[in-house]
Structures are given as C-alpha cells and as structure tokens.
Amino acid sequence: DSLPSKKARTVALKRDRKRVHNLQKAYQKQVLKHGDPPILFDILEMLGKPRVDEILARNEEFERVPPFGEEVVVKIDRLSSHGDGLALTPQGDRLLVVPFALPGEVVRVYPYASDRFVFKSRIVEILERNASMRKESLVQCRYFGQCGGCQYQMIPYEQQLELKREVVRRAFMHYSKLDSSLVPEVLPTMPSPERMHYRTKLTPHFDLPASLRRAYGKEVPAEPVDVAIGFDNPSTGRVMDIEECPIGTPVLNEAMKRERQRVR
C-alpha cells in the first residue's frame, strides 16, 4: 500500500491537534466546575508522578499512543471509584479502563476511546478469572455486562459493601485536604435489607432517531417512534432499550414503564 500523501498527513495532523486542544479545554472546564476527577489519583498512583509530569511536559496526555486500537493482554490492578477495572498498559504510560473486569484478572482488551491519560477498553476475553469475586450465578439482569447502570452484580454482597467503603475512604483521603491523622475512620457500609430492588433513583436516557433530530422544531409525527429508552452501553456509547431494572424498586420500575410509553 502507498503511504498517505504529504497533504493528507498535514490534514490528519491538524485534525489531531484540534482534537487534543478541544479535549484540553473540556478537561480544564470540568476541573473548574467539579474539581479533580477521582481517576486522577489512580493515574498518579499507578503511573507514578514522575511519569505523569514527563508526559505533561511533552503535552501528550491526550495522545493515542500504543496500544490504542490494538488488542492487548493486561492484569487488572484495582477498581476505580466508578467500579471499572484499571490496568497499566505494557508501556506503563496509560491506564486502561475496563468495565466489568475485576482485580487480579488477566484479560484481553481492546482500547477503543481515549481520554486524559486513559484508554477506555472493552473486554475481548477473560483469560484468568478472580474466582473469589466473580460469581456469575449472582447476576439477575440479562443486560448486565452490557448496560453501564451497575458494575457489581457478580460480586458477593459483603465484598460490594467493602468496595463502597473503600470508595468513601479514598474520597476522604484525596479531597478532605486533611492530614492523614485527622481523617476519621470510615465505618463499615450499612447493608440494605434487600439485595435487589433497593435503588430508589434511576436515570433512564433516550436518543431520538437522526431523522427526528433533523426535524427539530417541526411537526412531530403522530405515530409511535421506535426509540431506545434505557441506559448507556459503556462500550458503544449508545442507549440500550431496557424495559426494567432489577436493582430499582418496584415503584420505580412501574413508573419507568409508564414513562417509556409516554415518550414513545
């Protein structure tokens, strides 16, 4: 195959520079509004501050370096505060964010999207499982593993509670600005009397078809619209059509049925 022309390479370089510039602006805006994201502390701990500073000095924190776009085998180090598996790339200069992967597991993943110091990745194959945490028999939702609404269904409940306790402990450690001796002990997470059907808040999403988005402000068709209403698939970024959530309370699920029908 012939190499891209000089003009094509120049256009691609300008496009990538614009992408990085826009990402940097968006990140700065996010930090001003919400403060440092929790994953920043995982980045500093796992890459090491000297490596992070080196990448920042080269202005390369958003670059799509290898193994972006290539399958790679890694070992999951920990879970993020959002419940996603985290692993270092073989090069040691990026974090892979892997939904539904567990600490200690060896997984083949595909990094498909990039952010600041991280590549969002999907599991291709689990090569070595964490047998003490991954209990597939606990899963009660047919969408689990695709839907991004929850991450812990395959984990025994007692371990879920400890994971949530650790999230709170790390939040105090990183955001309180207190000396470690002044940070209060985080007590064990109080269990819910219900293992399922306990969540009292759900936030379903929907995407209008492109034809309706283009017709914004015009007359809306009277016939029902085939639109997915549910929760995001983290691997595709698309909304999955989900009629019921087994974690939500019965009252919420009844309300969701009505609202789904009303939107359609």
Regions found by a protein language model. Name each.
Residues 2-264:
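Accessory RNA-recognition modules of RNA-modification enzymes
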